[in-house]
Amino acid sequence: MLTKREKKELGIGKDQGKAILRYARISPRKVRIVLDLIKGKDIDEAYAILRYTPKAASSILFKLLKSAEANATNNNGLNRDNLYVAEAYADQGPTLKRILPRARGSADRIRKRTSHITLVVKERS
């Protein structure tokens, strides 16, 4: 496993823009539905899909895609017109546990799930 410094010296990751959102208060299952729509698409097409998809994850992913694009163009000097969504995945974060009171003094547990979302954009060659 390489450290951040070693990766920088070797130039690893200079061909991509990456954005990670951690602890997003949305279930990873719901995020994956929208992620599957934009995987492998050109960046402009991905923006259009996210803008017109009526899901809660769409607005979160729109901002994340914007950040990944900015990282690719500003930090790594990639051409915006050739960018596409190379990788997109959502992993499960820690689950917040809450209690819902029920009849006769019992209680149910509510699981409020969180996700770690990663978007990677690369240049098409």
UniProtKB/Swiss-Prot annotation:
The source's superkingdom equals Bacteria
Q: Which GO terms describe its biological process?
A: translation
Transmembrane regions listed in the UniProt entry: none
User: What GO CC terms are in its UniProt record?
Assistant: cytosolic large ribosomal subunit
* Record GO terms (molecular function): rRNA binding; structural constituent of ribosome
Q: Which InterPro entries match?
A: Ribosomal_uL22, Ribosomal_uL22_bac/chlpt-type, Ribosomal_uL22_bac/org-type, Ribosomal_uL22_CS, Ribosomal_uL22_sf
Keyword Ribonucleoprotein belongs to the record: yes
What keywords tag this UniProt record? Ribonucleoprotein, Ribosomal protein, RNA-binding, rRNA-binding
Under PROSITE patterns, the record lists: RIBOSOMAL_L22
> Which HAMAP family has this protein been placed in?
Ribosomal_uL22_B
The role this protein plays is: This protein binds specifically to 23S rRNA; its binding is stimulated by other ribosomal proteins, e.g. L4, L17, and L20. It is important during the early stages of 50S assembly. It makes multiple contacts with different domains of the 23S rRNA in the assembled 50S subunit and ribosome.
Provide the family line: Belongs to the universal ribosomal protein uL22 family.
Protein name as it appears in the record: Large ribosomal subunit protein uL22
Lineage per the UniProt record: Bacteria, Bacillati, Bacillota, Clostridia, Eubacteriales
User: What gene makes this protein?
Assistant: rplV
